[in-house]
Amino acid sequence: TCYHLIPEYLYPFDYETFSKYQGKAYSVATDIRSGKPVYFRIRDLKKDIDKIRASASLPLVSRNVKIDGREYLDGGISDAIPLQKSVLDGNRKNIVVMTKEVGFVRKPATQLPLIRMRYLKYPKVAELMENRHINYNQQTAYIENMQKSGKAFVIRPKRAGNVGRIEKDVEKLKALYREGYEDAAVCYEELMKYLKEQ
């Protein structure tokens, strides 16, 4: 799968540096039976790859990921931008990387009938998807407030992208990667200043 092929062969990931990281890393996935977000602690990227895979398994597109007898899908269904969890964990400074531009408002899901049918055994998935736009928009308002109060530093695209959730056009993906890299580079000095402030 891409979760092994890319980091191990195509674009080797620096596993050694990650293993030396002193902080805590998490991935968030949605338990499709309970509808609750689950925050998996990531200690070893190779061993914990299914926890990462679960956090990015989109409804209708990906298979459910089974971990310890439970099934999971993308964390964005139940907690799209887990800043609140980070704050509750005691983090005073947070870096939030957004994939949408300032002013973006998520609209209601258009595939609800299909989602209800596909996840008939898991009604919480359809329920979450039905309210996802409301929760997402509330989270972005929370992020803006946290940014104003200095508890969050936000990196986001300057403009709307033209890349879909399941984009396969390599040139579009490369262009989006470059744009994201440039957006982060532009605010690097400001970010370093934010991190050094007490």
Model-derived features with residue positions:
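Patatin-like phospholipase
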Residues: 1-198
